[in-house]
Amino acid sequence: MSKIIELPEILANQIAAGEVIERPSSVVKELVENSIDAGASQITIEIEEAGLKTIQVTDNGEGIDHEDVPLALRRHATSKIKKQADLFRIRTLGFRGEAIPSIASVSRFTIETATENGQHGTLLVAQGGEIEEHEPTSSPVGTKIKIEDLFFNTPARLKYMKSQQAELSHIVDVINRLSLAHPEVAFTLISDGREMTRTAGSGNLRQAIAGIYGLATAKKMVEISASDLDFEVSGYVSLPELTRANRNYITILINGRYIKNFLLNRAILDGYGSKLMVGRFPLAVINIQIDPYLADVNVHPTKQEVRISKERELMALISQAIAASLKEQDLIPDALENLAKSTVKRATKPEQTSLPLKENRLYYDKERNDFFLKPQVAEQQISFEESAEPIHEATDEKAEPQPTSVKFAERKPASYDQLDHPELNQASLERAVDKLEQEEKSSFPELEYFGQMHGTYLFAQGKGGLYIIDQHAAQERVKYEYYREKIGDVDNSQQQLLVPYIFEFPADDMLRIKQRMKLLEDAGIFLEEYGANQFILREHPIWFKEEEIEDGIYEMCDMLLLTKEVSIKKYRAELAIMMSCKRSIKANHGLDDYSARDLLFQLSQCDNPYNCPHGRPVLVNFTKSDMEKMFRRIQENHTSLRELGKY
């Protein structure tokens, strides 16, 4: 008897499903891509329990003929290609004929479809790949596919599913990418009756970007365009001031297909040159039109890996297109715009509206534990607050209760002093936390301050000789120990905001933040859902300075998105490192004598005044002996050759 047998088709489909259908988002991707290939202009995706209970995709495409519907459940049955040569001219998103049979083999599958010229529609019901019903029905032109109880017959796969929030986040990401790839299609994603994503389908890519990432982000995107004999590159990239902490916001499309390609990611970063800060990445949507003969999409069943001929030439074209577009832009952030933002909420951000722009010396305010350009700023704040009147907006009484006024938070460009901090990334933060936990309090010499150099280094003398102090590293250490103590010191001491802040995030980020909201709450930050893809902040811990709120909350959420499973203790420590680095005195800022002496005093009170949180030295010491050697006032001890017994 032969040992080798041909597997039953249903079993073969279940095996294939292991590669094609990894999770609910894989089902959504395959079904929506089929709808796009069918010429749909409107696609609605409805899911329940993150797709594990129900996934329903409805489109207004061309539909499937009655006699072809059962064939759609047969493996390698497709309308996209007919002969070998077609493999080299693929312009559709699907072509392998594996998705539908793979999905049907691991779910309870229902399809209703009708064509424009058909006499009636078609209803087909299958369970585990076995067709149970196939009959005519009344149905509008287009296709509706409903998937129920995904993986009901492969329980081992269910065990490896993540939380519903995580799976939903993957689905939202898939729809976002497809929306960017096909702005001409109107997408609607509904989860458990709640609308998550909606795009207009106008064909305008910038509008699609605004629908996904928000209007403020879309305004800071720059159009790019370039072409040669083989490639056409178009799309949008963010200004250097608008960055994110990872590459997740880079979308690369080839002939309308979202792909992942490390070298093309590298080309995008190369286009920015030195304009990007270390550890920061742009937002980008790059659409590449290419002769299908130069791109092999038949590499993996998911079709996200594509092999490209002339890849180096394409990389150069992308880099040049981005560099050329950025060169035409005014890359200096609009100071007037920032000042206008600060005046929207005068009663709560007075120090930003009162800065004397002609002076560059910093003064330390002991009460507020911070530096200002002018010592009178802290005093002016009181009279300013008394005279300022909050701005109130008219509200509809019938509408949902809203605060009298809100401020939409924007991500401000991070300071370029981060170029000095290549260690400001997740891996180095974790290493720094481990080292900091082992620190012990040490003694510190009494220092007498007497000068500053280049607005960066402080000079002081003590019994040990001359000390040179890096003022940024020094305050970074001071701030770190302040934040380390305060972050997570959650009590009833919350400061109510006169004008609450609104923070906007993409839908998939919203889901992940909600999933890990407990970490933020344990750090003293309480965000409430407010409208579509928005959080509102109504109060903040007293230790959190109000002028730090916009950047601080976005930074805390960015870190939340980057961090894997972590304890609240470690999350607080990493936040303390990041916030101390970004909020310390920058280089090239002169300090008055009082502020410099106060900084040295604060440094002396630190548990470890010798290193910044990243481990870099805060100060170096030249002893009197070292100085005398440098000026050759004393000589090194020498032993003569005769004394060594050579002669």
Swiss-Prot record:
> Which family does the entry's similarity section mention?
Belongs to the DNA mismatch repair MutL/HexB family.
Q: Which GO terms describe its cellular component?
A: mismatch repair complex
**Which Pfam families does the entry mention?**
DNA_mis_repair, HATPase_c_3, MutL_C
Region (Disordered) residue spans: 390-423
Keyword Repressor on entry: no
Which gene is the coding source of this polypeptide chain? mutL
Q: Name one GO biological process term.
A: mismatch repair
Which InterPro entries does the record cross-reference, listed alphabetically?
DNA_mismatch_repair_MutL, DNA_mismatch_S5_2-like, HATPase_C_sf, MutL/Mlh/PMS, MutL/Mlh/Pms-like, MutL_C, MutL_C_dimsub, MutL_C_regsub
Its function, per the record, reads:
This protein is involved in the repair of mismatches in DNA. It is required for dam-dependent methyl-directed DNA mismatch repair. May act as a 'molecular matchmaker', a protein that promotes the formation of a stable complex between two or more DNA-binding proteins in an ATP-dependent manner without itself being part of a final effector complex.
What is the designated name of this protein?
A: DNA mismatch repair protein MutL
Q: Which GO terms describe its molecular function?
A: ATP binding; ATP hydrolysis activity; ATP-dependent DNA damage sensor activity; mismatched DNA binding
Which key words are in the record? DNA damage, DNA repair
Query: Which residue windows does the record flag with biased composition (Basic and acidic residues)?
Result: 390-400, 408-423
Question: Which Cys pairs are S-S linked?
Answer: none
